[in-house]
């Protein structure tokens, strides 16, 4: 080997050592088990599943997009289960009823639960028992008054949400009246038939899986007069539109969609009814007054042929998958045969997120 080749070889070796040293110096410390947030990791794996890259500690949407160029955008689908349940305010202290209703709720394991006629007895029981199952309660009672013997003024339309899945961003309760932010206000300004304060409870939640920020409203409309229900619907829809984010709305609304078309139209102008939007659905009454069939008269009333309990979702935001009525059978008028005078309802939705690059 002549001297010139020898010098070139030495220089090449020196350069290689220099490059290796720079690489070691500039290489960031990588922990053995990188602490990647669950949501970020989920997005990253969804985006980069096809090319099997972007699995390091620096994983992020932008990095994924750069490393996975040439691959089609990847979508992820997330499920939401919403349950609405009128508890019947008269039985909050009945241990048999309470246990049956708790079993019914836990058999579905909803992500979101809206209840109506939740008295203090019901709230004390459900808040404590559902807390151990991972649910948090939000809701105010419609009044602090206890002056009415039967229709307790201390009644709420509370919301329970899965705390492992959702992060609370904001919440509140307003009254179904011309003065919605006045606590305990009655809707006499809408119609003189109004007897009691009525409330709507709402939450804004952030889904820890999809990252979606959305709202959920839950209420119990007046049975006294159509005008009260119509004005209540318009008020709630206006609050949903003010937020400007995807939303669910559930409740015992005390009207049939085939009878009070104006009230139903006020809601469905903005939201889809899960019963009619779902490919898998059920029909029939949800208020049965302990065993009366759809269309059958009882006392001074008559059961509707369609639900008066509803779950809605804002148009174009969620795909309704299924709607079901959790019906029971028993002897007509036998309170002990049924968990409530209403059947609970459940709607399943899907949200599809496309991660663009």
Regions found by a protein language model. Name each.
Residues 117-213, 324-325:
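Structured beta-strand-rich core segments of catalytic domains in phosphoester-bond hydrolases
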Residues 227, 240-247, 255-357:
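Metal-dependent phosphoester-hydrolase catalytic domains
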Residues 18-21:
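C-terminal motif of bacterial Sec signal peptides marking the signal peptidase cleavage site
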Residues 1-6, 10-11, 23:
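Positively charged n-region of N-terminal signal peptides that target proteins for export
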Residues 23-26, 31-34, 65-132, 142-155, ...:
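N-terminal, active-site-proximal structural segment of metallo-dependent hydrolase catalytic domains
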């Amino acid at each position: 080997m002549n001297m010139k080749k020898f010098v070139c070889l030495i220089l090449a070796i020196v350069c290689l050592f220099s490059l290796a040293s720079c690489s070691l110096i500039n290489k960031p410390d990588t922990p053995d088990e990188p602490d990647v947030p669950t949501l970020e990791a989920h997005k990253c794996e969804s985006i980069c599943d096809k090319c099997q890259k972007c699995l390091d500690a620096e994983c992020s949407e932008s990095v994924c997009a750069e490393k996975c160029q040439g691959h089609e955008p990847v979508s992820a689908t997330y499920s939401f289960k919403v349950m609405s349940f009128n508890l019947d305010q008269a039985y909050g202290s009945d241990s048999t009823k309470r246990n049956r209703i708790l079993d019914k709720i836990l058999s579905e394991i909803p992500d979101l639960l809206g209840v109506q006629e939740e008295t203090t007895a019901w709230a004390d029981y459900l808040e404590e028992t559902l807390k151990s199952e991972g649910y948090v309660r939000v809701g105010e009672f419609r009044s602090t008054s206890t002056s009415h013997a039967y229709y307790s003024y201390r009644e709420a339309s509370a919301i329970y949400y899965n705390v492992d899945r959702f992060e609370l961003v904001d919440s509140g309760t307003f009254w179904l009246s011309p003065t919605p932010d006045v606590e305990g206000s009655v809707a006499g300004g809408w119609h003189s038939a109004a007897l009691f304060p009525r409330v709507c409870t709402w939450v804004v939640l952030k889904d820890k899986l999809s990252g979606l920020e959305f709202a959920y409203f839950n209420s119990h409309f007046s049975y006294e007069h159509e005008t009260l229900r119509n004005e209540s619907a318009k008020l709630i829809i206006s609050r949903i539109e003010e937020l400007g984010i995807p939303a669910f709305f559930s409740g015992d609304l005390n009207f049939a969609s085939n009878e009070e078309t104006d009230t139903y139209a006020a809601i469905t102008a903005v939201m889809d009814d899960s019963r009619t939007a779902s490919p898998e659905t059920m029909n029939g009454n949800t208020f049965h007054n302990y065993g009366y069939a759809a269309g059958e008269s009882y006392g001074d009333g008559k059961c509707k042929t369609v639900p008066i309990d509803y779950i809605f979702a804002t148009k174009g935001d969620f795909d309704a998958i299924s709607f079901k009525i959790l019906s029971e059978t028993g002897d007509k008028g036998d309170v002990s045969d049924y968990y409530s005078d209403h059947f609970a309802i459940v709607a399943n939705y899907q949200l599809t997120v496309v991660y663009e690059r």
